Each structure stands twice: as structure tokens, then as C-alpha cells.
């Protein structure tokens, strides 16, 4: 039996020697065939077990593929948005493990030991040493091993790789290919002293590495300015030239997009996009969700009771106004608009007011309909709108209140009697005072006297016939008659004259 050169093989089969007798050769051949049969059975058993393990893994992978395909098929016809969260950056449930060897290495060979134990002890005892031929003695040859065939250069490189550089890879430290990415740097990730490799470098290389490191740190501290700052005055060269569409904020056309999109394949229909403005409000009041509600103003409503028939036929009837609040009630029936200067209403008679009983307050919310065609039907009517302030009426009121220099009253020329003979017309330049028109006439006479330069108004008018004609055209002021009309009639005549 010779030692096999394949030291890493777990199986060894004995070879039949050529210097054995016939009986020993038969026994040795039987043992070798038995060992070969066991070896073949063991090899195929290991192969079958490995195939079974691989088949189970493939079946698990197929099951995972089927489950994933079923999920995908379920999502194909769905119209709902689905969020998928990965468990990790690279989702994987198990850690990579080294693949088990199909034929593991064995330290001892139990088959060969069993074969050696089964050999008969008296195999070679039947033949004496003298019977053996000297030619059958074992012949030894000197054979060089693999280690002795290495050249000195290869051995030196191996030693250099073990000692210099980053060193050899640890036996149990590298478990996957991504772990080798740590060797892209100049630092040995598995060593305790990370700066040990620097001491083994030549001094020039050390200075070069130091200068490069300082340059890198300097570049990291201050990066070059961007193109927009370095060349802000120059325009960027575009392949299309200056013909670019740059709409303003309000010049871009509005795209008419429907609110509900049609049935599109592969598009979810329950997606909701919230604008950024709504997510981050700017108004400080939106930060407080529950704001206290302000109390309502306590305004009472106003009830006006009129006769239903009088309101329908527009016949004035007794009206009793009861003002309780400051704000008018909602409009339900609009009365006829009064004239712009509303005259003061006559005082209602006390007998009618006392005879009409005061009905209970009628609800004014909502539309109010007459309950019955009785003479006194409560209707909810608003207060008449206040008269608009007219600047002309204000001016007339101011003029009436002034009344000229001596407090005279203005009269309409139509109200003056036609048969009254005015003595002031015969008196040329006679000073007539008492009302505003007379004062204006006197002022005009003084102005004419100042223009003509004469001290006597009679001489000024006598020497100028044109002025005499103008003075004749201007009507003389009308003198008010005492006790003719009351003050109310005077005010009405004044309004008629100026209107």
C-alpha cells in the first residue's frame, strides 16, 4: 500500500502490490474492491444529500416567487394606492453563511484503519525472509516536494506580502464580498494599530502623503465659488440660444384639468395631494385651532303695527311706532319711499292711540304673512331709511339760518303780490335793507360806484345810460308782509322758490 499524493481527499483506496503471492494478491484484491465499493457508495450518498438540500432551497425560492407573483397579480387590477415599506436598505431575512462542503476534509481515514485492522496477521509468516528474492525488496526514489520547487523570488514575495502592506486577510473576519470594500483605503481595518503601515513607508512617500492630505483638507475647508457667483454678469451659453420661454408669474397659461380623471389603467384613484401652503400656514391665527366665538350683539328688533287694508290700498292710517332697538329688523314689506325732505308727521290723536290695544310682540324672524284681513293686523315693517344728506339742502339751510345781515327771511318772487307798488324803484339808488337780497343790491351799487369813480350813486347812474338800463332790469327786493303767513309757510315757500 502506497501513500496517496492527494492529501486533501477524504477517501483513499489501497493499491494491490505486485510483489505478493497468489493468495495474498487475491485477499488484497478483495479488500481493495470492498474499499472501492464503500467509497463509491459514500460519494454518491453525499452527492444525493447535496442535491436534496439544493432541491429544497430551490423549492423554497419557487414558493417565494409564487407568493410574490400572487401579490403582484392581486395589485394589477387594484385602483387604490398602496405603500410598501422595506425592512432594511437591502431587505434580507438571513445572513450569508458559508456553503457546506460536499466532501469535507477528514483528519483520519477510518476506512484505511479498518482495512489495516482486517489484514491477517500471518499473511507474510508463511514465507520466510530467505524465500524472498532480493529483487523484490523495496526500492526508494528521491522525489522533490512542491515546497522545494519554489524559487527564491517567489518565497521573498510571499514573505513581503505577509509582513508589509495591509497584511493578510484574517481567516474568520471576511464573511462576504462587501466586507472586502474596507480594503480600498490605506488603513488596515482588522489591525489594532492603524498607523503601523505609515512607519514602514519610505520618508519621501510619507512627506508626499502628508502634502496630499494637507491639500485635501484645504480644499474641503474652502470650495471654489459656483458659476453663478464667479460669472454672474455673463450669461450661460445655451444650445438653443436666447430663445427660451420664461413666463412671468401671471403670464403662464392656466391648464384646465378635470377634478376626476377617467379610468386609467395602472393609476390609483385615491391619491390625495396636499398643497405646501396648506401644510405650512403663514397666518399666525391658523396655529390656534379652537378660537373663542365672539358673543352676538344684543340688538332688539323693532315692531311696527299698521292696518293691513291701509297698507294694501296705500291709505294713510294711524301708525304707532315703537322703537326699542337701534338696528332695523329684516325687511319683509317695503313701504312707499317718502320724499327726500320728509315733513314731520302730525302728532297722533291721543284718543285713537289709547283706543287701540297694544298687541303682543310678534316674531320677526323669517317671512311674516298677514294673519287675517282685520283692521289691525301686525306687520313687521322696517324703519324708513334716513334721508340722504344733500349738500345743496345743507347750503340752503345755512342761508335760511343766517337770514342776511339783519336776520331777514328769504321769500320766493312768485309769492309777492302783483298789485303792490314798490316805492324803492322810484328812488334811484335808495338804500333798502332788511333782507339778504337788499344787502346784495346795495353791494352791487357800491361796486358800480367804485368802478365809475363817482361818490354819488345818482350821478353814476345818470351819466351812464347802460347802467341805468341794467338797474331797471334787475328786480327790486321784495319786502316781506308782516303777519301774512306763519313761519312754517315761509319755510315751505323758500323751499319751493329754490327748488
Swiss-Prot record:
Result of knocking out the encoding gene: Lethal. Larvae die at the transition from third larval instar to prepupal stage.
Highest taxon, organism lineage: Eukaryota
InterPro entries: WASH1, WASH1_WAHD
Comp. bias intervals (Acidic residues): 490-499
All copies of domain WH2, residue ranges: 391-413
GO molecular function: actin binding; alpha-tubulin binding; chromatin binding; gamma-tubulin binding; GTPase binding; lamin binding
UniProt xrefs under Pfam families: WASH_WAHD
Stretches the record annotates as Disordered: 317-433, 448-499
Coiled-coil features, chain-numbered ranges: none
Gene Ontology biological process terms from the UniProt entry: actin crosslink formation; actin cytoskeleton organization; actin filament bundle assembly; Arp2/3 complex-mediated actin nucleation; endocytic recycling; exocytosis; heterochromatin formation; microtubule bundle formation
Assigned keywords, A-Z: Actin-binding, Differentiation, Oogenesis, Phosphoprotein, Protein transport, Transport
Positions carrying Phosphoserine: 491
A GO-annotated cellular component: nucleoplasm
Pro residues bias: start-end ranges: 333-363
Subunit structure, interactors included: Component of the WASH complex. Interacts with spir and capu. Interacts (via N-terminus) with Rho1 (via N-terminus).
Sequence similarity: Belongs to the WASH1 family.
Main function: Acts as a nucleation-promoting factor by activating the Arp2/3 complex to induce actin polymerization. Participates in both linear- and branched-actin networks. Functions in linear-filament (bundled F-actin) by acting downstream of Rho1 and regulating actin and microtubule organization during oogenesis. Nucleates actin in an Arp2/3-dependent manner and exhibits F-actin and microtubule bundling and cross-linking activity in the egg chamber.
Protein name: WASH complex subunit 1
Naturally occurring in which organism (per UniProt): Drosophila melanogaster (Fruit fly)
The encoding gene: wash
Amino acid at each position: 500500500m502506497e501513500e496517496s499524493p492527494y492529501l486533501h481527499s477524504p477517501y483513499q483506496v489501497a493499491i494491490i502490490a505486485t510483489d505478493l503471492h497468489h493468495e495474498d494478491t487475491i485477499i488484497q484484491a478483495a479488500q481493495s474492491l470492498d474499499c472501492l465499493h464503500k467509497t463509491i457508495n459514500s460519494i454518491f450518498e453525499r452527492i444525493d444529500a447535496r442535491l436534496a438540500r439544493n432541491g429544497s432551497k430551490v423549492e423554497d425560492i419557487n414558493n417565494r416567487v409564487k407568493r410574490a407573483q400572487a401579490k403582484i397579480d392581486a395589485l394589477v387590477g387594484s385602483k387604490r394606492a398602496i405603500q410598501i415599506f422595506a425592512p432594511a436598505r437591502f431587505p434580507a431575512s438571513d445572513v450569508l453563511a458559508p456553503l457546506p462542503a460536499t466532501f469535507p476534509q477528514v483528519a483520519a481515514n477510518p476506512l484505511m484503519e479498518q482495512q489495516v485492522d482486517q489484514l491477517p496477521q500471518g499473511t507474510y509468516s508463511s514465507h520466510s525472509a530467505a524465500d524472498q528474492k532480493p529483487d523484490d525488496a523495496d526500492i526508494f526514489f528521491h522525489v522533490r516536494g512542491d515546497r522545494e520547487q519554489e524559487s527564491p523570488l517567489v518565497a521573498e514575495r510571499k514573505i513581503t506580502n505577509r509582513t508589509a502592506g495591509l497584511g493578510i486577510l484574517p481567516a474568520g473576519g471576511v464573511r462576504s464580498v462587501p466586507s472586502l470594500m474596507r480594503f480600498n483605503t490605506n488603513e488596515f481595518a482588522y489591525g489594532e494599530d492603524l498607523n503601523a503601515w505609515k512607519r514602514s513607508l519610505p520618508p519621501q512617500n510619507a512627506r508626499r502623503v502628508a502634502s496630499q492630505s494637507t491639500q485635501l483638507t484645504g480644499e474641503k475647508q474652502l470650495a471654489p465659488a459656483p458659476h453663478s457667483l464667479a460669472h454672474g454678469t455673463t450669461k450661460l451659453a445655451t444650445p438653443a440660444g436666447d430663445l427660451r420661454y420664461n413666463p412671468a408669474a401671471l403670464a403662464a397659461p392656466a391648464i384646465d384639468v378635470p377634478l376626476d380623471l377617467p379610468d386609467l389603467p395602472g393609476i390609483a384613484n385615491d391619491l390625495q395631494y396636499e398643497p405646501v401652503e396648506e401644510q405650512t400656514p403663514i397666518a399666525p391665527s391658523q396655529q390656534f385651532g379652537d378660537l373663542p366665538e365672539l358673543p352676538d350683539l344684543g340688538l332688539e328688533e323693532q315692531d311696527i303695527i299698521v292696518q293691513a287694508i291701509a297698507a294694501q290700498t296705500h291709505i294713510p292710517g294711524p301708525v304707532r311706532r315703537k322703537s326699542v332697538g337701534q338696528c332695523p329688523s329684516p325687511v319683509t314689506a317695503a313701504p312707499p319711499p317718502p320724499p327726500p325732505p320728509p315733513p314731520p308727521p302730525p302728532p297722533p290723536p291721543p284718543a285713537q292711540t289709547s283706543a287701540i290695544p297694544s298687541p303682543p310682540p310678534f316674531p320677526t324672524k323669517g317671512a311674516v304673512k298677514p294673519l287675517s284681513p282685520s283692521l289691525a293686523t301686525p306687520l313687521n315693517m322696517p324703519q324708513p331709511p334716513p334721508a340722504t344728506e344733500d349738500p345743496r339742502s345743507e347750503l340752503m339751510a345755512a342761508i335760511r339760518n343766517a337770514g342776511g345781515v339783519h336776520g331777514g327771511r328769504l321769500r320766493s318772487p312768485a309769492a309777492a303780490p302783483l298789485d303792490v307798488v314798490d316805492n324803492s324803484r322810484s328812488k334811484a339808488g335808495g338804500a333798502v335793507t332788511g333782507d339778504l337780497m337788499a344787502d346784495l343790491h346795495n353791494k352791487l351799487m357800491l361796486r358800480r360806484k367804485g368802478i365809475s369813480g363817482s361818490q354819488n350813486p345818482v350821478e353814476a347812474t345818470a351819466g351812464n345810460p347802460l347802467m341805468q338800463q341794467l338797474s331797471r332790469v334787475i328786480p327790486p327786493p321784495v319786502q316781506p308782509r308782516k303777519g301774512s303767513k306763519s313761519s312754517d309757510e315761509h319755510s315751505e315757500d323758500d323751499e319751493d322758490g329754490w327748488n
